[in-house]
């Protein structure tokens, strides 16, 4: 999809990949609707995008709060914007063992990563269809392709997104809806710092693999190239991407490697 003069809604725009993608897209002379929970951080992203010459509308909300999402959507709808694309980058990660994680933590992860994402998507989809079709992207993860230690519900929530958006695409191809799954590996962001632990509180530590990961701005450039081409999947990362192929072609080796992952 050509981005020039298009209206694109981006969630998770306060930090990490979402923020980097918003800044990268702002170079394309488009109209960005930016969402996230932290309004101060959202305004910082807005300032960076405005410097690149794009128009910006802020629509803050909490992905874990359905009512908050609905209010933000209604506020945007009143402006009668012609929405051409929705790019879902908001979410939270996890750092806890299965047998030490209470259900309320599992539910919290799903409320943000799965239900929050599909809530906004279901609200925006009819608007995109009404405007003649458009592009929707959702952010998965390498562990949306396979299970991984200390990320059980995070991995499950990302698997769920694949099922939902593949179904959405099958149902709405006739409506000129295109869908992209963004699948990042280790990217140098604060996702591990902000991950939830077994108590449902902030993990507060930067993983070594995250610290050595691909810079967010480099990741964003790769993602935006893929979004422009409307690829079905955008796999982005360093050598960690090979795990997808190991899991598919040599599963016994994958399980051996995964079992050796150390506690965070």
What are these regions (language model features)?
Residues 30-44:
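Conserved glycine-rich Rossmann-like NAD(P)H-binding loop of the short-chain dehydrogenase/reductase
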Residues 7, 14-15:
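Conserved glycine-rich cofactor-binding loop
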Residues 97-98, 102-110:
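Substrate-binding pocket helix/loop in short-chain dehydrogenase/reductase
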Residues 141:
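Residue(s) in the substrate-gating loop at a strand-loop-helix junction
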Residues 60-71, 103:
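The beta1-alpha1 cofactor-binding region of Rossmann-like NAD(H)/NADP(H)-dependent oxidoreductases
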Residues 174-238:
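SDR active-site lid
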Residues 121, 157:
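Active-site helix of classical SDR
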């Amino acid at each position: 999809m050509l981005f020039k003069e298009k209206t694109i809604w981006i969630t998770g725009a306060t930090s990490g990949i979402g923020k980097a993608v918003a800044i990268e897209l702002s170079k394309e002379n488009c109209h960005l609707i930016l969402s996230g929970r932290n309004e101060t951080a959202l305004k910082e992203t807005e300032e960076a995008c405005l410097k690149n010459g794009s128009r910006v509308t802020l629509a803050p909300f909490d992905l874990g709060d359905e009512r908050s999402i609905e209010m933000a959507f209604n506020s945007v709808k009143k402006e009668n914007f012609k929405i051409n694309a929705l790019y879902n980058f908001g979410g939270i990660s996890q750092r806890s063992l299965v047998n030490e994680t209470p259900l309320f933590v599992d539910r919290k992860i799903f409320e943000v990563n799965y239900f929050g994402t599909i809530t906004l998507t279901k609200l925006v989809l009819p608007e995109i269809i009404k405007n003649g079709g458009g592009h929707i992207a959702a952010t998965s993860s390498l562990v949306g392709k396979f299970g991984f230690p200390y990320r059980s519900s995070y991995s499950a929530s990302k698997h769920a997104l694949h099922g939902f958006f593949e179904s959405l695409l099958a149902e709405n191809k006739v409506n000129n809806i295109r869908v992209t799954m963004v699948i990042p590996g280790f990217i140098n962001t604060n996702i591990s710092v902000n991950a939830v632990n077994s108590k449902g509180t902030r993990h507060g530590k930067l993983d070594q693999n995250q610290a050595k990961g691909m810079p967010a701005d480099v990741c964003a450039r790769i993602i935006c190239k893929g979004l422009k081409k409307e690829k079905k999947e955008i796999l982005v990362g360093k050598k960690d991407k090979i795990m997808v192929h190991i899991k598919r072609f040599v599963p016994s080796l994958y399980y051996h490697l995964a079992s050796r992952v150390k506690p965070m």
